[in-house]
Curated annotation (Swiss-Prot):
It comes from Chlorobium luteolum (strain DSM 273 / BCRC 81028 / 2530). GO terms for biological process: translation. Keywords: Ribonucleoprotein, Ribosomal protein. This is Large ribosomal subunit protein bL19. Belongs to the bacterial ribosomal protein bL19 family.
């Protein structure tokens, strides 16, 4: 059974996705189909959760839009993802940042920044 799952996951096309950790601020370009037209929509926010592995991995991204918190669960290997850009690397001591849901204003997106060394 495990071999069958690995075979299916190996054939799944995926977007080259950088390493995403809770606390990172990301911008995800998603393809949106409206009627017969297709356009790109940017969703920028803080990764508050990741779960799963392989082809079934998902991340939860949270942003504040006009004073209202918006969360979106995004499958990492979705064919609707055009690109993923990490804007800031956050330093989080937890794997799930659900406590950000209770915060308001700028504090709702405040996560300490983590220094990342560039490797060539």
């Amino acid at each position: 059974m495990d071999q069958l799952i690995q075979l299916v996951e190996a054939t799944q096309p995926g977007v080259e996705c950088p390493a995403l950790n809770p606390g990172d601020t990301v911008r995800i370009q998603l393809r949106v189909i409206e009627g017969e037209k297709e356009r790109l929509q940017a969703f920028e926010g803080v990764v508050i959760s990741d779960r799963g592995a392989g082809a079934s991995k998902t991340i939860t991204v949270r942003k504040i839009s006009h004073g209202v918190g918006v969360e979106r669960i995004i499958p990492v290997n979705s064919p609707n993802i055009e690109s993923v850009t990490v804007l800031k690397h956050g330093k989080a001591r937890r794997s799930k940042l659900f406590y950000l849901r209770k915060r308001t204003g700028k504090a709702a997106l405040k996560v300490k920044e983590r220094k990342v060394s560039e490797q060539a």
